[in-house]
């Protein structure tokens, strides 16, 4: 459910069959789907909708615009009936039926994958299992547990303090404005931001660089009212009047809306920056990979940026656009001085130049060619030291987030002129593929470096599309993928603060240090689990991303996964303790009891506890009265199965055999009836890792017991 909090919650259910593919919308107002989602479903009034002449209406005949905001967020994919979609990035948001909705079924919605990436909502959720084998979803930042995956995703996006999703240091706009903790942007002459939703109306990239002397920029992106916009009372994004742009307060509102549309408002997403005081442009890079994992510590960049006073990484302060962040980090560092002042004449001139080239408008997520990065607020020291922030949307086993990245030498900044020429490999910065096209002179602009760093003379345009960083010339409208892999090269910072501003004052240095140490312990624990899983050949659910040797081993030795081939992707339920993979959830549930020691079953005769029902069934046979067919002829020990008896004779009575004891000749069978389904008569396909002292390692499952 999104919008204002409602008590009691109203749900929307179908009064008739709703066909798959039906579209509802557009969704009005501020889009905050999942902000009030929780594991519990509070009972409340229900609104029924039905099809009338091909359109869904409620009991009173109201259109979807009147009740679409009452549709609650889905907690998992099983109960989800609708998905939120947008035809274009920044376009209006609609709801689409995923399947045929039966009468009486509640309408629930969640983000589509593309829209989730746009809003920086995690798209994957890996469950863990508690001592009872129930699925739980853990936030690796604050250790809160959830029963449903979407509850965790919503928590990370809107509420988790440590991940930057909400509360505490990273306040939402409305919270920061109420507390008066938002300082005005230094040098811009703007008042503090008024209360505003999380996602504001989109605006052009030109508004990211306000200049007091420049004319009002022209909107070239079209009307986009559906996604990341202000409330319905906000002015139109297609025709901003000069009077609105002329006033400082209105200009601040428009600037905030533009920044909210840009990647800076996507502060909960991945942001990888390698900043250094280099004189070359490629010595420092930054980009948004797109999808982030909800289960690895990924808030370091945001926290580090907040700790160092980075304005565009704090939602509670004046923010800068994602294109600006990319441009500034590509430029090799920060330029000191106030914008538009004598301290940084280059910045002011470039801003003036930009406003006279309003036809070069791009999506706010794109970096315009020739746009200079903005300077930091006065007093912010220029950092010449290298800082690497480990935020990569790659599997944890493949890329470690705790290694150090060495800055590329200035020679790596030389851009080859060939269209598909490869950049020379730089130490510490391996480039898998980088083909730079010949940039049109119209898309280039020379920009003199500041006092602390130097921007390159050639700055291509960058954008993010489908989760991949693209670059190219805006004049040719041709973009090419740029893939950077920093796996195994990033080092975890020694000390880092999760908070800044008023929140930091409430915490002592010891508490801040303990937060970082907790994050390090989590990372080391996850790394150990990953190494164990990879060593067993079962640590990756997708064997296609494994090395050939490990993938081949995983295809033949996966526990409980059946006859999976080495070339087939392995899917199933993974044990986080030992890395075993099970095709059935029940198998993992029983297996987890061997690690946790949870034994809910008991023998009715001797009250011995068991965790595996198959072990209990085999144990009960030991209490059978009368003659048992599986008794050792050498020592009289009673066993449960034929294979247990054979194993017992081989280990306890070496040199003896069942055939010799039978005395019927070498070709005769002993007088033991075959076990049904022998030799594969296991009552369970669960691999048991016994950790208690009551287990007999000889039989591996309690098949041999002394009475």
From Swiss-Prot:
The keyword Lipid biosynthesis does not apply. It is an enzyme of class 2 (transferase). Residues 232-242 have a biased composition (Low complexity). Keywords: DNA-binding, Hypogonadotropic hypogonadism, Intellectual disability, Metal-binding, Methyltransferase, Nucleus, Repeat, S-adenosyl-L-methionine, Transcription, Transcription regulation, Transferase, Zinc, Zinc-finger. In the embryo, expressed in neural stem cells of the hindbrain. Residues 184-213, 226-255, 336-372, 545-567, 647-707 are annotated as: Disordered. A zinc finger (C2H2-type) spans 137-159, 573-595, 601-623, 630-653. One of its GO terms (biological process) is hypothalamus cell differentiation. Its main location: nucleus. Residues 554-566 have a biased composition (Gly residues). It is found in: Nucleus. One of its GO terms (cellular component) is nucleus. Its EC number is 2.1.1.-. Residues 351-365 have a biased composition (Basic residues). Residues 1-112 form the SET domain. One of its GO terms (molecular function) is DNA binding. Belongs to the class V-like SAM-binding methyltransferase superfamily. May be involved in transcriptional regulation. Is required for the differentiation of KISS1-expressing neurons in the arcuate (Arc) nucleus of the hypothalamus. Is a critical regulator of GABAergic cell fate in the cerebellum, required for normal postnatal cerebellar development. It is linked to Cerebellar dysfunction, impaired intellectual development, and hypogonadotropic hypogonadism: An autosomal recessive disorder characterized by delayed motor development, ataxia with cerebellar hypoplasia, severe progressive scoliosis, moderate to severe intellectual disability, and delayed puberty with congenital hypogonadotropic hypogonadism. This is PR domain zinc finger protein 13. It comes from Homo sapiens.
């Amino acid at each position: 459910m999104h919008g204002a909090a409602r008590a009691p919650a109203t749900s929307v259910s179908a009064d008739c069959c709703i066909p798959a593919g039906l579209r509802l919308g557009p969704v009005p107002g501020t889009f905050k789907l999942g902000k009030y989602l929780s594991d519990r479903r509070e009972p409340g009034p229900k609104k029924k909708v039905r099809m009338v002449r091909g359109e869904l209406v409620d009991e009173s005949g109201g259109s979807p615009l009147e009740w679409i905001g009452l549709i609650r967020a889905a907690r998992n994919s099983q109960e989800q009936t609708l998905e939120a979609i947008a035809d274009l990035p920044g376009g209006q948001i609609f709801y689409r039926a995923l399947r045929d909705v039966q009468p009486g079924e509640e309408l629930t919605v969640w983000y589509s994958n593309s829209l989730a990436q746009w809003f920086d909502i995690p798209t994957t959720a890996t469950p863990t299992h508690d001592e009872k084998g129930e699925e739980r979803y853990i936030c690796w930042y604050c250790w809160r547990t959830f029963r449903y995956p979407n509850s965790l995703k919503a928590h990370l996006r809107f509420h988790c303090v440590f991940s930057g999703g909400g509360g505490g240091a990273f306040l939402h706009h409305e919270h920061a404005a109420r507390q008066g903790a938002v300082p005005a942007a230094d040098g811009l002459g703007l008042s503090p931001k008024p209360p505003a939703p999380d996602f504001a109306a989109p605006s052009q990239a030109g508004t990211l660089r306000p200049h007091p002397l420049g004319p009002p920029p022209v909107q070239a992106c079209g009307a986009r009212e559906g996604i990341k916009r202000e409330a319905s009372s906000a002015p139109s994004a297609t025709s901003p009047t000069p009077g609105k742009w002329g006033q400082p307060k209105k200009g601040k509102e428009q600037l905030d809306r533009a920044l909210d549309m840009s990647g800076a408002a996507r502060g909960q997403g991945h942001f990888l920056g390698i900043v250094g005081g280099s004189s070359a442009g490629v010595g420092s890079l930054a980009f948004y990979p797109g999808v982030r994992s909800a289960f690895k510590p990924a808030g370091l960049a945001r926290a580090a940026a907040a700790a160092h006073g980075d304005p565009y990484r704090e939602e509670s302060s004046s923010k800068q656009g994602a294109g600006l962040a990319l441009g500034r980090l590509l430029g090799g560092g920060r330029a000191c001085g106030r914008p538009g002042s004598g301290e940084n004449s280059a910045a002011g001139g470039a801003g003036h130049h930009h406003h006279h080239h309003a036809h070069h408008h791009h999506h706010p997520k794109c970096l315009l060619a020739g746009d200079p990065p903005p300077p930091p607020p006065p007093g912010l020291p220029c950092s010449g030291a290298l800082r690497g922030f480990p935020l990569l949307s790659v599997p944890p086993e493949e890329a470690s987030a705790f290694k150090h990245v060495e800055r590329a030498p200035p020679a790596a900044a030389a851009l080859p002129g060939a269209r598909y020429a490869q950049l020379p490999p730089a130490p510490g910065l391996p480039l898998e593929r980088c083909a730079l096209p010949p940039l049109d002179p119209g898309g280039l602009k020379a920009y003199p470096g500041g006092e602390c760093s130097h921007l390159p003379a050639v700055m291509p345009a960058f954008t993010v599309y489908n989760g991949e960083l693209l670059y190219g010339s805006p004049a040719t409208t041709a973009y090419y993928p740029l893939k950077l892999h920093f796996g195994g090269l990033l080092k975890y910072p020694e000390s880092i603060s999760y908070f800044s501003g008023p929140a930091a004052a409430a915490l002592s240095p010891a508490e801040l240090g303990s937060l970082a140490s907790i994050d390090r312990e989590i990372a080391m624990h996850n790394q150990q689990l990953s190494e164990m899983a990879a060593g067993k050949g079962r640590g990756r659910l997708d064997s296609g991303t494994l090395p050939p040797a490990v993938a081949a081993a995983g295809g033949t030795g996966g526990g409980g996964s059946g006859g999976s081939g080495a070339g087939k992707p392995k899917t199933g339920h993974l044990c986080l303790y030992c890395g075993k993979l099970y095709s059935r959830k029940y198998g993992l549930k029983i297996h987890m009891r061997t690690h946790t020691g949870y034994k809910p079953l008991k023998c009715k005769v001797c009250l011995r506890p068991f965790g595996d029902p198959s072990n209990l069934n085999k144990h009960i046979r030991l209490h059978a009265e009368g003659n048992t067919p599986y008794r050792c002829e050498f020592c009289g020990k009673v066993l449960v199965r034929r294979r247990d008896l054979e194993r017992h004779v081989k280990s306890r009575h070496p040199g003896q055999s069942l055939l010799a004891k039978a005395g019927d000749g070498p070709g005769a069978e002993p007088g033991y009836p075959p076990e049904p389904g022998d030799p594969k008569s296991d009552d369970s396909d669960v691999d048991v890792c016994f950790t208690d002292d009551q287990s007999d390692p000889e039989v591996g499952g309690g098949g041999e017991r002394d009475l």
